[in-house]
A protein has these predicted regions:
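A short beta-strand motif characteristic of beta-propeller blades
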Residues: 163-169, 205-210, 247-258, 316-324, ...
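Short loop/turn segments that connect beta-strands within beta-propeller blades
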Residues: 159-161, 200-204, 242-246, 291-293, ...
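Asp-box/WD-like beta-propeller blade repeats and closely related beta-sheet repeat scaffolds
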Residues: 212-284, 302-320
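Residue-level detector of Asp-centered blade-edge/turn motifs that repeat once per structural unit
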Residues: 138-140, 182-183, 223-224, 271-272, ...
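Repeated scaffold domains used in trafficking and secretory/extracellular systems
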Residues: 131-133, 174-179, 215-221, 260-268, ...
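The canonical Cys-X-X-Cys-His
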Residues: 33-47, 98, 154
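Loop/turn-rich, solvent-exposed surfaces of beta-rich toroidal or solenoidal domains
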Residues: 420-489
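Extracytoplasmic electron-transfer domains, predominantly the class I c-type cytochrome c fold
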Residues: 43, 48-52, 57-106
Length: 528
């Protein structure tokens, strides 16, 4: 018995040693992802993965790129870019290690200070001397800027003939919608990894570029065209530029006492107020930053003792006016008077999404919107219905359009759709609103058309088995343009009255299209 116990113990010990040896061998054979990155990737994507010739490879920048897609890109490369596939050079396990490693945080965390922003700026020689008139013959007010996310290009479309006029390469992953100067000559693009590109539409050339941050949400252009503001996720900052993309100042996205900081959810221009309005992702505040040279001075908090210096104001222009909220806003849009901001909250953990109305004059939440699910208020529209002003918004969770009266903040109707959607669009001269169901696995191929006078669905158009989304109208509202949101996609032109297809242009995942006139006139049917 003693011998048997000894043999068993010896066997267990030998098995343990064998397991350790095997584990050690596996560890030694495991690919060294940091070394592989330095050898194959750093030259284009930067030593700290902050980007260079190629985009940033930070977790914040890759949050919308699924890991299987990242693996595919490393393996096969990207068409029409300098990203070559590494399948011939690396083993499958090495590629897998790289794909996993780029989603891990960089330590120590990279920084992006004012000096870095200024050093990043480049200007195209001679761009300022280009003629102040288009080099092409189309209507500059009915021009469409089409962002093709499939191969990171931008197409310019004649909105009368529906012909592509020009196509050029863009920065990686443009986001948040391009913004136009007030006369429609210049367009400003913001990329996920922080670059702002100023492009001269009339002369078909880049004017200047600057990197505002390492991970950026969107940009806004002031109504007078003099100022550009960028909202950053990383670092937690806002960056203010002049029209030539020269840095004016940065704002730390923190509470007034500096104890908490936040990602910046979005920044939008409020032209009638001569200000930028800013939502913070992690702090329950909505900021308003005036660019009016005659803006009234700002006082932080209550002034009750001038001897303590509490009555000393801050300059009104470019100062931060804070509206304190119960919960942070993920995104928002305005009523046509720009008195109210409608924002959606995406709480963490067990909390439920909700919507709130912020009065920008009294600087507080004045109503909660009775919307279930996950409202996508950043894509809402407003219009008149039976003598009342209403807003309508798609829902990211439920197949529904919620219609709310703006005077009472009470629900008017919930319009059922085939599935949850992301975009809703209309036009002042059109009777109809169009919405997609692109968040639905079964109805992503369907656009639902709603009669704004009856609030009833009246028709639908389909692209079977493919994603159909993001409507934009021509400046006169006669035609509606939709995206087949696929790599081998297309731009489809529909008659906005009969809903019949008029023309189809092949494009590479046209994620968004933007009409110059509708954007600069702040059409009630599109995002601002």
């Amino acid at each position: 018995m003693k011998s048997l116990r000894f043999s068993s113990s010896l066997a267990l010990a030998l098995a343990a040693v064998a397991s350790l040896v095997a584990g050690s061998a596996r560890a030694q054979a495991a690919p060294d992802a940091p070394a592989l990155y330095r050898q194959h990737c750093a030259a284009c994507h930067g030593e700290q993965r902050t980007g260079g010739m190629g985009p940033a490879l930070l977790p914040e920048s890759l949050e919308r790129l699924r890991r299987p897609e990242a693996l595919k890109v490393i393996t096969q490369g990207r068409a029409a870019t300098q990203m070559a596939g590494f399948a011939p050079a690396l083993k499958a396990e090495e590629i897998a290690a790289l794909a996993q490693w780029i989603y891990t945080p960089v330590l120590p965390a990279p920084t992006w200070a004012d000096a870095d922003i200024r050093a990043s700026r480049v200007e195209t020689p001679g761009a300022k001397d280009l003629p102040a008139k288009p080099v092409w013959s189309a209507d500059p007010m009915n021009l469409f800027v089409v962002v093709e996310g499939g191969d990171h290009h931008v197409s310019l479309l004649d909105g009368d003939r529906f012909e592509r006029m020009h196509r050029f390469a863009s920065r990686y992953a443009l986001h948040g919608g391009p913004k136009f100067s007030p006369e429609g000559r210049f367009v400003y693009f913001g990329s996920r990894d922080g670059w702002i590109t100023k492009y001269d539409l009339w002369n078909l050339t880049v004017v200047a570029e600057v990197r505002a941050g390492l991970n950026m949400r969107n940009v806004a252009v002031s109504g007078d065209g003099k100022w550009i503001m960028a909202a950053n996720y990383f670092p937690h900052t806002l960056a203010l530029f002049d029209a030539d993309l020269k840095l004016v100042k940065t704002y730390a996205a923190t509470t007034a006492d500096g104890r908490a900081s936040s990602r910046v959810s979005a920044v939008y221009d409020a032209t009638p107020r001569q200000s930028f309005v800013v939502a913070l992702k992690d702090i329950p505040e909505l900021w308003e930053i005036s660019y009016d040279p005659k803006a009234e001075p700002l006082y932080d908090g209550l002034v009750h003792d001038y001897k303590m210096g509490e009555g000393v104001p801050k300059p009104g222009q470019f100062g931060v006016k804070r509206s304190r909220l119960d919960e942070p806003l993920d995104d928002f849009y305005f009523d046509q008077a720009y008195t109210h901001a409608f924002g959606a909250t995406r709480p963490k953990g067990e909390g439920q999404p909700n919507a709130q109305v912020v009065n920008l004059d009294v600087r507080r939440t004045i109503a909660r919107l009775p919307i279930a699910g996950m409202p996508h208020l950043g894509s809402g529209i407003t219009f008149d219905w039976q003598g009342r002003r209403v807003m309508a918004s798609p829902n990211l969770k439920d197949g529904a359009i919620d219609v709310i009266e703006l005077d009472s903040w009470k629900p008017v109707k919930t319009i059922r759709t085939p599935g949850p959607g992301f975009f809703m669009r209309s036009h002042e001269k059109s009777r109809f609103a169009w919405t997609d169901s692109m968040m639905s696995p079964t109805a992503r191929d369907t656009l639902t058309i709603i009669d704004k006078t009856t609030l009833e669905p009246v028709a639908s158009v389909r692209e079977p088995g493919r994603t159909l989304a993001h409507i934009e109208f021509t400046k006169d509202g006669r035609y509606a343009l939709a995206s087949v949101w696929e790599m081998d996609g297309a731009l489809i032109v529909y008659d906005a009255t009969t809903f019949k297809e008029v023309k189809r242009l092949p494009m590479s995942k046209p994620v968004g299209k933007y009409n110059v006139f509708n954007k600069i006139t702040r059409s009630e049917g599109t995002s601002h």
